[in-house]
């Protein structure tokens, strides 16, 4: 039998109509830095790490933003570099039509137009992906740990056909609803 290095990279078996892809192969994001202080009276929609837990971006004026940010688009998926064990993955959803969308440089931005963003979020929140993230961190531990974008872009993720992505998203939403319903009845 011939040695095939390709199969050594396959993390686990997937259905025949799914494909394994490296994040770098699907990511169309090209970084564009914006200094909000150059537009002090403009208001921005800012995806920052501290506001992640609220589920909502913040809406500061340019004069109140201390550092340059990265311009993002609706549908981009943000993967937090800081403390990757905290599993912070966020889908950019435009709240205010007239505001420029920005993200902190502490996010790895994934723009994969052919893949449903919610599916990417679920995949990147999975134990499989979390284990990958934790396998190549830098820093001495605790709050100093960082995911390395050069490694992350080489991680392989399973991509099903669009209809299957939709089904997975719907099924996970149903399970989450069941969990929330049960949790609300507990003392």
Residue positions per predicted region:
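A short beta-sheet element
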Residues: 68-70, 74-125, 129, 140-142, ...
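Generic, well-ordered alpha-helical scaffold segments in large soluble proteins
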Residues: 26-30, 78-81, 85, 113, ...
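Sequence-specific dsDNA recognition surfaces
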Residues: 8-9, 24-35, 47-77
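Non-catalytic DNA-recognition/assembly elements of restriction-modification systems
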Residues: 3-33, 159-171, 175-187
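Active-site-adjacent structural elements in folded domains
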Residues: 63, 137-142
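Short coil/turn segments at secondary-structure boundaries
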Residues: 3-5, 36-44, 135-137
